[in-house]
Every structure is written in C-alpha cells, then in structure tokens.
Amino acid sequence: MASSEAPPALASGPVAWIRENLFSSIPNTVLTLLALYVIYVIVPPLVQFAFVDAVWSGTDRTACATEQQGGVQPNGWFGACWAYVGVYGEQFIYGRYPDEELWRVDIVGLLFFGALIPLLIPSAPFKRENIIFISVVFPVVALVLLTGGHFELNGFMPTGFLFEPGMVKFWVDYLILSAIVVGIAYAIARASDKDPMPGMRGAAIFMVGIAIIMAIFAVDFGLEHVPTDRWGGLLVTMVIAVTGIAVSLPIGIVLALGRRSHMPIVRFFSVVFIEFWRGVPLITVLFMSSVMLPLFLPEGVTFDKLLRALVGVAMFASAYMAEVVRGGLQAIPKGQFEGAMALGLNYNQMMRMIVMPQALKLVIPGIVNTFIGLFKDTTLVLIIGLFDFLGQIQSSFTDPTWATPVQALSAYLFAAFVYFVFCFGMSRYSIFMERRLDTGHR
C-alpha cells in the first residue's frame, strides 16, 4: 500500500502569487522584507502627516501653529496645513490672472480636455475633426481668450523706409515673407527633381492660413487684455508643457528624417540642430532666450518673455524627440523599405503609410518619457521670472499670514501630488497604447 503524501502546494490564488513573486528565493525574500521595512518607515508617518493630523480649515497661521508658535495646536503637533493650500489654491492654478476674467481660463481648460479625452479614447468617433480642432482651432481660440486678442500688428522686415509701422507695413512684410517661403519651396522641389507646383501650392495655402489667423488676432473682441506677466501657476505650466509637446513631436519627426536623408545639406543642418540643442542645458537655453536674445534684436523689436521660453523649450525638446524617433526608424527592418518601394510608393508615401507608423509604435515609451521629462522641466522657467506652478507655490512662502514650520512641507507635498497625477496619467496611457498596438516582438 502506497504511503500518503502531503497535498501539493497551492498553485493559484493570492498565497500562490505571493510565494511565486515575493518569496520564490532567498534574494527575493530579502528584497521583499527590505521593501516592506521601507514602506513601514515611510508610509505611516506620511499618512499621519497628510491626513490624520492635518488641518483642513482655518483663516491664518494660528490654525497650523502650535501654542509655542502662537497658534492653537498642542505643542508637538506636526501635520499638513491644507487650509493654507485651500486659501492659495486659486493662485496656485491661475497665478495673478484677474479674478473677474478667470472664466476665460476655465473655458480654455474645458475646451482642451473636452477635445483631448475623446482623442485619446480609441473607440471615440470624429477623430479627424478632433485633430483639426485641437491642432488648428483650439490654439487660436485659447490665445484670444487668454490674452484678450486685439494684437497690434506692426512690420517685422526692414521696409521702414517705405511704410510707417502699422497694419499696412505688416501685410506688406507678410507678402514679402510669403513670396520668400514659396520661392524656397520651389527651390527645394527643383533641387529634388520634382514637380514644384505641389510644394508651392502647399506653401501658399499654409501662408494664407497663417494670414487668416493673424487677421483674427487683430480683431477686437471686447475682452480685457491680460499680459502674460500676470499669468502663473498651473496655467503657465500647462501652456509651456502642452506647447512643447505639440511642437516637439512633429519637429522631431522632421529632424529624424532629415538626419537620415541622403541630401547632404539637409542632413548637415539636421545634425547641427540636434547636436547643438542636445549639448546645451535647458537652463542655459532659457537664460539666453530671456536675457541675451533681446540684446541682439533691432531697436524697438521685442518678444514676449513667455514666447521666448516657449520657443526655447520647444526647440530643446525637439532635439531629444528627434533622437527618439530616429531610434525607431533604425529599428525598422530593411525589408519594409524594400517592400514599400516594390509597391511603387514614393518617399513621402512610404514614410507616411509604412515606415513612420511602425517606427512611432516602437518608440512609444521613449516618446512619452520625453513628454514626462518636458512636463517636469517646466519648473526651470522660474529662473527667468516666469511663475509656473512650483514657482507660484514658492512665492506664497513670503506671506506672513501663513508662515509656519509646516507651510513649505504642505505646499511641496501638494505640488508633488499634482505632478504625480499628470506624469502617472501619461505613463499609464503609454502602457495602454503599447498593449493596444502590441509593440512587443515575439
């Protein structure tokens, strides 16, 4: 008679998962115990500070100060001062934007997220309409609402000896610029032995579109003008991050293609652009754009400080994005290019329909990682006097009304939570898209 044996170990369920993933070997067991110890050391005090001992209401520093500090809390109390965050919450989001005009910022936010969310949902309809709205219509509407519109259009070319600064000079200069752009399109087409008409037509349509947008900016909509130096908080962070993300991806794609181009001039300028911006710290870029650039401009020509920061951040991010996209292009097998050419596709069709979709699919993690880094790098604009979300929080520390030992800790914890929500959201969506597009190779 066979001897009885113990039943086999549980092969499914939480106990089996814990045994397999956390205590499967001696090194895993040591790492698990070490992680549990770190969690025990960090999480309970954090929960105690942020929730259990936190102060949720109050009108001044006395609500978040101990009796020895002139407050109402017992000596030895140590908790978050969410009352202070609640009082300054509006300033953390809008900066010094006029209170009576905050509805304009709210509308811009609703329009942006209202168009972005359906665009991110794969099954949502009207994708093309959403893309057109968020890439063409929304920037115009947002700029008019946030600034008030009614921009003064002056000339930007050395034609002052013919016209006085004003609307007429601007449109004359714009016609000259349009002719130059169309001429460049013609020269590029001729150098590539292609029909110049499609390129010239596209350049002309593009310049006409820009002219329509500029005409809209010049219209007086009756809105109060709000200069960008009154913007701040999360508004500035979102403006810089969204602009940088929206601009860096298409420019990065063009630069990546240019660096792989067989035309020496295109490849040379693409390499120079990428290596220059990659070799300079972002702080230096912001400092140069804000302090040094105005010194090289003609007298009377100025650019808004926020605009200079937007250009610097966008160019900086574009260089890194170009290398991410180039990595995806290099990962595409040569057979994909040969198959596309065998089908009779030209270069543009091959890149648009065959190569680029596969390349972008492969580098989704790198693209989103660049976006996350760009979002966090917006905090550097404080060095040039722009008060982004973190800068606006730091500026509130000078208010003696809420000066307590826990003021800065509460504010930085709130800032960390906000940044985590945005960055974690981008990370999770990246994982979702990877799984949906099946970027793995079996």
Language-model features, listed with the residues they occupy:
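Transmembrane alpha-helices and adjacent helix-loop boundaries
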Residues: A2-R442
